[in-house]
Amino acid sequence: MTTQLEQAWELAKQRFAAVGIDVEEALRQLDRLPVSMHCWQGDDVSGFENPEGSLTGGIQATGNYPGKARNASELRADLEQAMRLIPGPKRLNLHAIYLESDTPVSRDQIKPEHFKNWVEWAKANQLGLDFNPSCFSHPLSADGFTLSHPDDSIRQFWIDHCKASRRVSAYFGEQLGTPSVMNIWIPDGMKDITVDRLAPRQRLLAALDEVISEKLNPAHHIDAVESKLFGIGAESYTVGSNEFYMGYATSRQTALCLDAGHFHPTEVISDKISAAMLYVPQLLLHVSRPVRWDSDHVVLLDDETQAIASEIVRHDLFDRVHIGLDFFDASINRIAAWVIGTRNMKKALLRALLEPTAELRKLEAAGDYTARLALLEEQKSLPRQAVWEMYCQHHDTPAGSEWLESVRAYEKAILSQRG
């Protein structure tokens, strides 16, 4: 530890102590909050089932920055490089299309054995794993419907895929000793005016009930469902709307996934957390950055990211909220994208932990909104960077932008060889 960092740390401890904050306790609490990194930033959601196929489902990864991962070994190596530059606990979020097999595997036939390499890798790197069925980029999703498909056989195919995915998820949790959160998102919807909005939702309701009918150990597996406002090619009607999934998660007591990009641009998920928590047992968050639509830009340390983190901390939702990231930018170095977005999420959580929330609550309860606003703004000037740098020091990761040097070196030595 440098003398300069020691001095800054001691000063920060004193400054925060003056407003009632124990910075060492804040760092301990931050280590209770793993962030689940999404594997698909590393290869633009290509997966290993059909890497040359088109990305469908109303989502897009734009850009052609060189060096994307082409196989599981490259993707795991890239993830390791990114994780070395991110302090604190992490998880990895996998999609079903990231299976490994020497022969083609139909999605309704995926098994734990197709993900055993991921589990062994997670054990070696002390990571938890989360999971997702992949209901897109497939011939049987080409017409825009999966779990709500009017064709019984196609709908059953996707039901069976989600059932198989739940067993993979439970395998993750059993092997790694931490529950896997499995999130169901489907692209189902219509491009133009829809006459019958009810029937697809009735089919989706019945399909989901069949999917979750097998009882799994909650210590190993957690079901989550995710809504969306619209997607490309599904601008007019989305079967799995917010109201549908809020009702489903409430009535079936599953987890509810809130994705920062899946609502109207004037809506924010930070305002939805406290409302949803009154009705559902757990939340899964997909922290993202929508620019005019669900563009999945890299997460910034912006007002909404901070507001999301503050909601988790202010309401002590550590054990009920699962923090995941969901962005994929192919226009910049993909490892840097992971590092920037994940570090920003962790910085936001730390800032929330350094807030004098108890004092702010007292002011709010007393109706002293002037002092509340004044204190909220003044605490932004406290030496939070020194605390972040000490946290990075504790976890042997770069504190400032020097992490970029490591990414550039890896790019030159490894990524540039991929073409």
UniProtKB/Swiss-Prot annotation:
<dbReference type="GO" id="GO:0008740">
    <property type="term" value="F:L-rhamnose isomerase activity"/>
</dbReference>
<feature type="binding site">
    <location>
        <position position="296"/>
    </location>
    <ligand>
        <name>Mn(2+)</name>
    </ligand>
</feature>
<protein>
    <recommendedName>
        <fullName>L-rhamnose isomerase</fullName>
        <ecNumber>5.3.1.14</ecNumber>
    </recommendedName>
</protein>
<comment type="subunit">
    <text>Homotetramer.</text>
</comment>
<feature type="binding site">
    <location>
        <position position="262"/>
    </location>
    <ligand>
        <name>Mn(2+)</name>
    </ligand>
</feature>
<dbReference type="GO" id="GO:0005737">
    <property type="term" value="C:cytoplasm"/>
</dbReference>
<feature type="binding site">
    <location>
        <position position="294"/>
    </location>
    <ligand>
        <name>Mn(2+)</name>
    </ligand>
</feature>
<keyword id="KW-0963">Cytoplasm</keyword>
<keyword id="KW-0413">Isomerase</keyword>
<dbReference type="InterPro" id="IPR009308">
    <property type="entry name" value="Rhamnose_isomerase"/>
</dbReference>
<dbReference type="GO" id="GO:0019301">
    <property type="term" value="P:rhamnose catabolic process"/>
</dbReference>
<keyword id="KW-0684">Rhamnose metabolism</keyword>
<dbReference type="Pfam" id="PF06134">
    <property type="entry name" value="RhaA"/>
</dbReference>
<dbReference type="GO" id="GO:0030145">
    <property type="term" value="F:manganese ion binding"/>
</dbReference>
<keyword id="KW-0479">Metal-binding</keyword>
<keyword id="KW-0464">Manganese</keyword>
<dbReference type="GO" id="GO:0019324">
    <property type="term" value="P:L-lyxose metabolic process"/>
</dbReference>
<comment type="pathway">
    <text>Carbohydrate degradation; L-rhamnose degradation; glycerone phosphate from L-rhamnose: step 1/3.</text>
</comment>
<comment type="function">
    <text>Catalyzes the interconversion of L-rhamnose and L-rhamnulose.</text>
</comment>
<dbReference type="InterPro" id="IPR050337">
    <property type="entry name" value="L-rhamnose_isomerase"/>
</dbReference>
<comment type="similarity">
    <text>Belongs to the rhamnose isomerase family.</text>
</comment>
<dbReference type="InterPro" id="IPR036237">
    <property type="entry name" value="Xyl_isomerase-like_sf"/>
</dbReference>
